[in-house]
Structure formats: C-alpha cells, structure tokens
C-alpha cells in the first residue's frame, strides 16, 4: 500500500491456507463454538495463531483447554500460564479496517510444545458472529505440522500473504486446460476478504 501511494503498481500472487488446514472459520453463538488445534508431536516451538471477526462489538470470552486437561480463561492482556507449565500470551487489537483480532501464542514447558489437541472455545452474548482463525507452526513443511482439526478448513475467504494489500492487483493460480471445467489451484487464494470485499 505504501508503494501504491508513490504511484507504483503492484501485481502479487494470493496464497491459500485453507487446503493445508491453517485457516478455518465458523459462526459463534452464545452457546459457544470451539476451534481445535492439533500438535502432532512434542517438539520445541510454539503455536502462533490469530483470530479475526468483523466489527468491535463481538466481545468474546475464550477458554483454552490444553492436552493435559488444564483450562484457562484468556485475559487478552499478556502472559498467563495453565499451572502445569504451559504458557500463553494473548492480545486483542482493532485492525485498520475496524475489525478485531485476537493474537495468541502458546508455549510448552521448557520450550517443548506438548503433543495433543488444544481447544479454544469462543462464546459471546453478541449476535451470531463469523470468526476466522489462521495459524502457523514452528516445523514441518507448509502442508504439515500444527493444523486445525475443527471446524473443517475451507479454501473460501483465504487471501493470504503476499496478496494482502488493499490496492494491489492480486492474481490467483487458475487452471483451465480445455476451458470446460476451470478451477483454482489448491495453493491459490480465492477470496473474498472476510468483509466481503473481492480481492482476487
């Protein structure tokens, strides 16, 4: 966006995290919905994740359940621990587009992230709100390692780095050998943005 302000035209590819289980989304109601993250093996590193929703009126409550059965209510204000050696950092910020984003980091005892499932339960008294989650892990190939187990990942709405500029021309990977059944490549972002803006 900064270079666009200087008159430079940007044409960039759009990545996709859904087909490799690094992006998932679902509607959250007052009864609560969970995002389940799977860590396939105990290794050094951390879970790095972000969750985003439209607007700033969602006011969620988020509870983390770790593989050892400990639960902790996120405060969105920095560091916490579950009492069993797992450390958590969480923070809630407003984005430039007026949405809210929850950033979450989970660290294991002595830097070793514990194998198993980490469940994040979102609840809110606000109207039904669509919550999106993105994540990355510290090891493995792009399509391996830490991933969402639920909700089911989806290619829709995934417009990822480097295709994240508001003003760039964003290009998808598109296949159409005979023009009878065109499709996006699974590694390509498809959009739209979570606010419905068409970006690809």
Task: Cite the ranges covered by each PLM segment.
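Extracellular S/T/G-rich loop segment that most often corresponds to the catalytic His/Ser-adjacent loop
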Residues: 7, 20-114, 122-123, 148-200
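A short "linker-to-beta-strand initiation" element
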Residues: 138-150
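Edge beta-strands of jelly-roll/beta-sandwich modules across compartments, strongly enriched
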Residues: 127-140
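Short acidic, glycine-rich surface-loop motifs adjacent to enzyme active sites
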Residues: 1, 13-14, 121-125
């Amino acid at each position: 966006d900064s270079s666009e302000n200087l008159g430079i035209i940007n044409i960039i590819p759009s990545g996709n995290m859904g087909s490799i289980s690094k992006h998932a989304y679902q509607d959250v109601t007052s009864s609560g919905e969970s995002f389940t993250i799977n860590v396939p093996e105990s290794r050094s590193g951390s879970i790095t994740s972000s969750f985003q929703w439209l607007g700033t009126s969602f006011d969620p409550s988020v509870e983390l359940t770790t593989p050892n059965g400990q639960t902790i209510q996120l405060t969105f204000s920095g560091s916490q621990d579950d009492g069993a050696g797992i450390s958590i950092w969480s923070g809630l910020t407003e984005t430039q587009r007026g949405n809210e984003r929850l950033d979450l980091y989970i660290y294991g005892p002595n830097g070793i992230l514990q194998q198993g499932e980490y469940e994040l339960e979102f609840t809110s008294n606000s109207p039904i709100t669509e919550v999106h989650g993105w994540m990355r892990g510290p090891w493995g190939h792009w399509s391996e390692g830490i991933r969402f187990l639920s909700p089911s990942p989806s290619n829709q709405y995934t417009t990822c780095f480097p295709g994240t500029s508001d003003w760039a021309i964003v290009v998808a990977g598109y296949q159409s050998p005979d023009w009878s059944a065109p499709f996006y490549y699974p590694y390509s972002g498809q959009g739209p943005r979570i606010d419905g803006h068409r970006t690809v």
